[in-house]
Amino acid sequence: MQVKAPRGTYDILPQDSVKWQYIEKIMRDSAESFGFRAIRTPLFEHTELFQRGVGQGTDIVSKEMYSFNDRSQRSLTLRPEGTAPCARALIEHGIYSGVMPVKWYYLGPMFRYDRPQTGRYRQFHQFGVEAFGSNSPYLDAEIIILLVEILRRLGLDDYELHLNSLGCSVCRDDYRQKLLQHISPFKEQLCQDCQQRYMQNPLRVLDCKMETCHQAIRGYPIFYDHLCPYCQEHYSRVQAALQANGISYIHDNNLVRGLDYYSNTAFEIHLPGIGAQSAVGGGGRYDGLVKELGGPDIPGIGFALGMERLLLALDMLGKSKFSNPSLDVFVVVMNDAYEMQGLQLVNELRRRGIRADKDYGGRSGKAQMKYAGKTAARFVVMVGEEEVEKHFWTLRDMQSKEQWQLGQEELISSIRSVIETK
């Protein structure tokens, strides 16, 4: 039997890792420039965290979670998203008693039992940010500005930002009743999933991708028209702040997001140039989440970006400008008798900040030189009888084909003078 990676998962091989490292660095640098700090939470949590936090009626909880019982019969779940674990960490460690807002970012794998397709996997990776402790609309704007800034630094300027308000608990309850009244006569025309969502959270019907459901509920009341005065003012200030910072957006009445914890500001970012699966990230405000999980009444807002989708977009839009790091030096040992000296030299080069390697396959000197060419190393250092006896090293520039005999310190300074100007 051939052992393969499970369906919906994949390996990130060395030639691809450089792409990941590139976008990860841009994301980290961007978040830290906005005052966010890194947090790492467990890959699995108690199942109840997601049932309470994400919502029992969501597709994630009802269909997509990887849950299992441990040996003590406790139900655990591989994390399907990153916000609820961050809220749990905030509560568990009492971090809300310090300076607010708390601003965190995270990066790592998530897990959902979904139908694998282009840009969508069962183990996937997200970069996300969370800010707890402020309900300022200007913090909402800052979070969105950070999202846009990451895309800009990646060269993805042709984006569409979709924006909506999902109101507070007061105006949402009022709207929920009006939406139920509108949908009720057509509930038999809804898809099976929406018939189940209908009573649990009718807003989820608006998020359905089935055309039959769109047709059945057409003419539904618009949430924006039912916002309370506070939520109207909050949303207006978010819009004004985005406009003042040159961020264009589309007000999208259909945008409700797929998780139950969202309130007030909600947003998604799309890259129209990559086809039907154009959404690469999104987020919003979740002012009731911390309290729902047993903590104090602390507001929060955040977003998550799908890293596989971003990499797909960079490839499709011709924005991939990645090159695998090459060696600076390959050390060629001309005779087995000098393996120890070769190993000492290669490790001294590494300690001095030079990317270096040597052969461990017993190749001849000629074969090692040929192999060094395949590694794309800029320099070769030859270690042989003459070099060891006379205490110098032979340095060869693989581009110019020039060759010198140098003492060790002169060798290192010569190599560094070239690689530091790359």
UniProtKB/Swiss-Prot annotation:
GO terms under biological process: histidyl-tRNA aminoacylation
Highest rank taxon of the organism: Bacteria
Keyword DNA repair applies: no
Signal peptide: none
GO cellular component, one term: cytoplasm
Catalytic function, reaction form: tRNA(His) + L-histidine + ATP = L-histidyl-tRNA(His) + AMP + diphosphate + H(+)
Record-linked Pfam families: HGTP_anticodon, tRNA-synt_His
Keywords: Aminoacyl-tRNA synthetase, ATP-binding, Cytoplasm, Ligase, Nucleotide-binding, Protein biosynthesis
EC id: 6.1.1.21
Subcellular location: Cytoplasm
Main location: cytoplasm
CDD domains: HisRS-like_core
InterPro entries the UniProt entry points to: aa-tRNA-synth_II, aa-tRNA-synth_II/BPL/LPL, Anticodon-bd, Anticodon-bd_dom_sf, His-tRNA-ligase, HisRS-like_core, HisRS/HisZ
UniProt similarity note: Belongs to the class-II aminoacyl-tRNA synthetase family.
PANTHER family the UniProt entry points to: HISTIDINE--TRNA LIGASE, MITOCHONDRIAL-RELATED, HISTIDYL-TRNA SYNTHETASE
Assembly, per entry: Homodimer.
Name of the protein: Histidine--tRNA ligase
GN (gene name): hisS
